[in-house]
């Protein structure tokens, strides 16, 4: 996949504290509540609920036993059900895609997720930036679009044309 192991480890560390905190809420309860009691996000979570039920059937999970986050994310990488169905892989080739209990499948699935969402091997993953025409330059990672009002200027050209979103 071309994704550095440090990036995958960082994501799994942030999302589930390396698998030690994968969520304690029943996924079916989270998704049902968010689907029907929160109109602003109802459409999104109804899609997740449908995907969760399909995933449970496809992977032979008991939908009443799976725990995850309050938003219905599951496993080491905290995949939502639609991402689990599309992007989870059987990285250890044991015949099962298990990103909830199997760290090997989770590692491969995080790499697959990044690759399928535009990861480019050997591309810059952070860009040093400084404030334009300001006295105190900043060297940190910024989301460029969100912070346009700060007049941030990357020190190197950034190419966005190859990135994609699903």
Regions found by a protein language model. Name each.
Residues 1-165:
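Catalytic glycan-binding domains that act on GlcNAc-containing polysaccharides
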């Amino acid at each position: 996949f071309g994704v550095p192991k440090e990036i995958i480890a960082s994501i799994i560390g942030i999302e589930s504290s390396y698998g030690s905190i994968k969520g304690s809420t029943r996924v079916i309860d989270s998704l049902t509540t968010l689907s029907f009691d929160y109109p602003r996000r109802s459409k999104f979570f109804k899609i997740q609920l449908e995907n969760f039920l399909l995933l449970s059937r496809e992977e032979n999970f008991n939908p009443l036993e799976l725990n995850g986050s309050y938003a219905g994310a599951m496993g080491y990488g905290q995949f939502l059900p639609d991402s689990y169905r599309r992007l989870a892989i059987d990285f250890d080739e044991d015949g099962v895609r298990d990103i909830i209990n199997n760290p090997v499948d989770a590692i491969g699935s995080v790499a697959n997720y990044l690759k399928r969402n535009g990861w480019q091997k050997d591309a810059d993953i952070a860009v040093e930036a400084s404030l334009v025409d300001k006295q105190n330059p900043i060297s940190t990672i910024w989301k460029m679009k969100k912070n346009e009002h700060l007049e941030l200027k990357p020190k190197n050209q950034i190419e966005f044309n190859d990135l994609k979103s699903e």
